[in-house]
Amino acid sequence: MKEILLANLDKLHTTDLGKVRLQKNLLLREENPVLWAKGFIQRSETKISHKEKNFYVFDNYIVLAINASSYTIIIGHKE
């Protein structure tokens, strides 16, 4: 799973509303949440699962949902 997502990091994106949700839900000060998400995905301690049409990237504190066909970051939240 992780290899697929890593191979397609250049396709990772979100909508304007998704950007606002990520910044709010994860308390990000990062101007570009997609850039932050790319770094999060690349961390060795993150895990990835695939359920139905989404990838779920997570560690002990954060979960990101990413559409598996469009690579759109749908939402992120703290556990």
Named regions from a protein language model:
Residues 1-79:
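Ribonuclease/tRNase effector modules and their secretory precursors
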